[in-house]
Curated annotation (Swiss-Prot):
PROSITE patterns named in the record: RNASE_H_2
InterPro entries in the record: RNase_HII, RNase_HII/HIII, RNase_HII/HIII_dom, RNaseH-like_sf, RNaseH_sf
Protein name: Ribonuclease HII
Family label: Belongs to the RNase HII family.
Cofactor: Mn(2+); Mg(2+)
GO biological process, one term: mismatch repair
Domain spans labelled RNase H type-2: 18-207
UniProt function note: Endonuclease that specifically degrades the RNA of RNA-DNA hybrids.
Disulphide bonds in the chain: none
Main location: cytoplasm
Signal peptide: none
Catalysed reactions, as listed in the record: Endonucleolytic cleavage to 5'-phosphomonoester
Molecular function, one GO term: RNA binding
Amino acid sequence: MINRKSFDDQIKLDHNITYLSGSDEAGRGCLAGPLVVASVILKPDYFNPLIKDSKKLNPKTRQVLFDEIIKNCLDYQIMIISSKQVDELNPLQASLLGFKTTISNLKITPDLALIDGNQNINLENIKTLSIIKGDDNSFSIACSSILAKVTRDKILDQYDQIYPNYGFKSHKGYCTKKHLLAIQKYGVLDIHRKSYKPIKKISKETS
């Protein structure tokens, strides 16, 4: 079992730092809905072994942990990037904008910002370190992944109320067979990402 807290503590020792932040996103590969980015600085003594990559937790557990993380952090920031913005920027640039914005807006400036993924991100006056599979290895990143996913899932649940024929509550905007069939039957919505190939294809076929 990976001790994500030990991973973060070792990084603090190696870099001789006090404040470490973690950042992750949710929804980058989705066909519909926003991309959500979260950054968090945790209290130094906070740890919960249940916390791991948000995708590996059930919704009820994620919500409980979301509330717990909020209570046990020094600060957190969440940015919601609309599907239109994702189309305008492209998914990668939208993610990078979210990381830069949420990290920069933390009330406590981190000595080092851990970011999930493999992209180098340059921030003025803040050192960053990208961690591949960061939500599996870093406690701070795992916490940020929960903040991002719970926030995004709530938005998709609201979309499910507005657009009941699309099944957003179950697939959360991802490219599933059920989702594609609904788009083919009921049409492309404003919340769909028009630059994504499956949406482009359906739009072309139905135009």
